[in-house]
Amino acid sequence: MQIPTDKYGAGHTLDDGRHCVHFERHLPYPIETIWASLTDPAHLTKWFPGLVFEAKLGGKFEIWFSGECDGPAHVSGEVSAFEPPYVLQLGSIRWELSAHGEGCLLVFTDILYVDERGLEYVSNSVLGGWHKYLDSLERHLDGGAGDPRTDVEVDYSKL
């Protein structure tokens, strides 16, 4: 299945029938810089403070979301892919990095667990949340700071 490029993210149905949200971000930094921001606790505390994990295949991870989160406030599981500096997968959440021009292409996918609220509601909620976190990553890479759980307003009209 060909999934279109989308900075703001989009919901898709995979060939196996599962649903996901998908983002692609072109970042003007080398892969190693992005990888460090995804995996180094010193970086994570600045843009994704609710994430902790063992940086190895089979390691444990935990994510704590807060604020007005419509989904689960806590997610945990195993690191299901760890291929430095290209692939990090925490359960259903996957970051893939590849060289792109003088920078990096970050491809982000999260497989959805649809509940009684329905696919559209869950997809839109998850899209908005991950959009905030990916924007926070970009601000961190640009030298800024901020906790996406508390200080980011998403322009939902762009999603």
Predicted regions and their residues:
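Terminal "cap-and-tail" regions of soluble proteins that handle hydrophobic small molecules
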Residues: M1-L14, G101-L105, I111-L159
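Hydrophobic ligand-binding cavity/cleft-lining segments
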Residues: M1-L51
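Hydrophobic/basic alpha-helical segments enriched in Actinobacteria
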Residues: R18-F23, S37-H43, F65, C69-D70, ...
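Glycine-rich, flexible loop segments associated with nucleotide phosphate handling
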Residues: H19-C20, P72-G77, V122-V126
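Hydrophobic pocket/interface hotspot
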Residues: I34, L44, F61-I63, V79, ...
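Hydrophobic-ligand binding "helix-grip"
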Residues: P49-K56, K60-E116
